[in-house]
Amino acid sequence: MKMEDMSLSGLDNTKLEALAHDVYSDLVEDACLGLCFEVHRAVKQGYFFLDETDQESMKDFEIVDQPGVDIFGQVYNQWKNKECVCPNCSRSIAASRFAPHLEKCLGMGRNSSRIANRRIASSNNTSKSESDQEDNDDINDNDWSYGSEKKAKKRKSEKNPNSPRRSKSLKHKNGELSGSVNPDMYKYNYSSGISYETLGPEELRSILTTQCGVVSEHTKKMCTRSQRCPQHTDEQRRAVRVFLLGPSASTLPDADTMLENEAYEPPDGQLIMSRLHWDASSDISPSDSASSKASTNNSESKRPKKKKPSTLSLTPAGERDKAQERDRIAGSGSSGSSSQNALGLSSRKKRPKLAVPPAPSIYDDLN
């Protein structure tokens, strides 16, 4: 007889019903528990009543498809400024200004990137210097040191004050620098002005001798224009000199004196020599005189006219020199027009020497 037959035969009907009830209750409990979990999750997530929404509430969120209004039923105004809320400072900003505001607010603009690049470069330089100190074995390697040597040479050429870039002649806004300016003054940047705090007394004196020197209230830089600067007055220049130099400011030359000295030219004897040559050429033959007159007129027309000094006058000694020069040129006039022209050119090119005591001549007895 089998085991199953024995177990079933030994059970009565009450026990069988109890077992069937237990199995059924387990199945119902599993089914109900799953449904309860699903309903609970739907309620917590907010989609339990999604299919059974009220029709009146649905009308509030209905998409509007009409001309002249947007999807929400509002009248569209194209002139109204669109506003955006900054996620960092929570300010409402116009849409056209939102991007630059966000760059500045978050620190992601151009200036911030430059600052970040400088920080990265400085950190790289510090780490590179530390690595160079640690790795001294590769100093003599040409492949590794070529770039650094090139950079070092470039830095030396930039620091060299005698480089051709620094030796270029600088100009004022109102004219060129005069020849009496100290060459050490070229090391300052004339486009941005000169800082008087870094200059010594001698440098200040040399600068204030030739330049305006009035200190700007905003930039704290000295004006590098001439002493006839139209932007500043004489009182301002005088006050700056007293402030910077103290009592020694009175020893500086005045602007009028500087201009008179620059405008003064010593009397040139070339004009006298050309006149002597003109007087002597009148004693030569007509053909020679015509050619010499034509050449002289051409040269005088090409040469710019000079202003005769009002105090120029010939003394008796000067008259004697003039007569001697006339006799000498008249005696040599018979040699021909070629020698005459050569003599005229040489007399024009040579500058007159210093005045020497006149030699005794036949005119002394007449006087």
Curated annotation (Swiss-Prot):
Domain SCA7, first and last residues per copy: 199-266
InterPro entries: SAGA_su_Sgf11, SCA7_dom, SGF11
Listed Low complexity bias regions: 116-125, 280-299, 330-346
Bias-annotated ranges (Basic and acidic residues): 318-329
Keywords in alphabetical order: Activator, Chromatin regulator, Metal-binding, Nucleus, Transcription, Transcription regulation, Zinc, Zinc-finger
GO molecular function, one term: zinc ion binding
Stretch list, region Disordered: 116-184, 280-367
Compositional bias annotation for Acidic residues: 132-141
GO process annotations (BP): chromatin organization; positive regulation of DNA-templated transcription; regulation of transcription by RNA polymerase II
Primary subcellular site in the record, as a coarse category: nucleus
Localization (cell): Nucleus
ZnF SGF11-type span: 84-105
An example Gene Ontology CC term for this record: DUBm complex
Similarity field: Belongs to the SGF11 family.
Record text about domains: The long N-terminal helix forms part of the 'assembly lobe' of the SAGA deubiquitination module.
Subunit structure: Component of some SAGA transcription coactivator-HAT complexes. Within the SAGA complex, participates in a subcomplex of SAGA called the DUB module (deubiquitination module).
Function noted in UniProt: Component of the transcription regulatory histone acetylation (HAT) complex SAGA, a multiprotein complex that activates transcription by remodeling chromatin and mediating histone acetylation and deubiquitination. Within the SAGA complex, participates in a subcomplex that specifically deubiquitinates histone H2B. The SAGA complex is recruited to specific gene promoters by activators, where it is required for transcription.
Protein name: Ataxin-7-like protein 3
